[in-house]
Amino acid sequence: FAGGAFRFVNVSGALQSAIAKVVKKYSNTIWVLIPLLTSIFTLICTVKGVNTFIPFAPILVVIAQAMGLDAIVGVGIILLGGAVGFSTGPLNGSTTTVAQELAGLPLYSGIGYRMVCLVVFAVVTNIYLVRYAMKIKKNPELSPMYGYTAGTQKSEEKSLDDFGPMTKTKSLILIIMAACLLVMVGGSLTFGWGMMDMAAIYIWMAVLMAITLRMSPNQAVNEFIAGMKTMLMAASIVCVAKAVSSILTAGTIIDTIIYGLSFILKAVPTILQGPAMYMINIVINIFITSGSGQAAVVIPIVAPLADMIGITRQTAVLAFNCGDGFCNYILPTSSALMGILSMGNVPYDRWMKFMWKLFLIWMVVGSVLMIIAQMIHFGPM
């Protein structure tokens, strides 16, 4: 139902107009504009996947080039901003809530420390991107994209005016979205709402947006179904992954895996067990790029494993979030990464010339945050 609800946000053009308004206001101050734009994608991707914004890539590239920057900055605003929101996962329904439910944790629990992680990663990521942008603005030859002109016509087909003004209707759409998300978080933390309750809120969100957009019942239903179709693959992967998990459990294979991993993690110094679990999830993500699929396969294993070695289950879920999320922005098998790079006309090899240092920084920052989570006994067991 989340896909169906957010379909109305996309159809309304509210996010597109909001971005265009911000760009027009701060276009002469790169150090302000870039963090503002990445923050938009960070906040939205706390609840949605980055692949939602594949169509945004051409316009962000145009914006970057208009400011004397390169296409990497344009796609980086989407990818890096979205990476922080998705990977820390304070409100993510396809990863965090799935993992917490499998781990036996209250939905959206631990949101306070997750928001701290989000802010830390956001600051580090924006510093990296702004420094890069200012460097290549001063000396364009330092850009990995220097001299690459293939496919630039595709990016120039759109402009800011294509998104239209920020109307009262579009503002109402964004208010409805924010209000529904706040209700979901509040209900989960206060009343212990589960996945069925979340689904009901998404339905109400869709209904209110359809009324705001003055859609006919038939049109609203068609749009809702079209949005749900985008989530079918993720839902199918979760079902298959849960089936695999059930087979592993029934055959007592999962017990053997947990026992073996416990020996590995026990050999690691106690203070580094959280980072070790983070690294394990990074490796697993190479083979299972779906966040919900990885949650369904990994959490039934790492949750009892965390109990064995004395790490809270909340820390194990956070290690899964970060390990699954950040790795997606270097893997050529990631649909979100390759889709946005393709739309922005940025070759994968040139993206990696820019990205590899930031990924190493993410690994270090993530490891430090895992150590802190372990030290404070993060969240309920």
Predicted regions and their residues:
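Transmembrane-helix bundle segments that line or gate the permeation/cavity pathway
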Residues: 49, 55, 70-102, 113-152
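Alpha-helical transmembrane segments of multi-pass membrane proteins
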Residues: 30-45, 69-87, 110, 119, ...
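Hydrophobic core segments of alpha-helical transmembrane domains in multi-pass membrane transport
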Residues: 1-7, 40-42, 85, 116-130, ...
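Hydrophobic alpha-helical transmembrane segments of multi-pass integral membrane proteins
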Residues: 28-59, 239-243, 248, 264-304, ...
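Transmembrane alpha-helical segments and their short flanking loops
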Residues: 89-116, 308-315, 335-381
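Core transmembrane alpha-helical segments of multi-pass membrane transporters/permeases
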Residues: 1-16, 193-256
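Re-entrant/interfacial helical elements at transmembrane boundaries that shape
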Residues: 19-20, 52-63, 93-103, 292-305, ...
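Long, contiguous bundles of hydrophobic transmembrane helices that form the permeation core
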Residues: 111-223, 353, 375-381
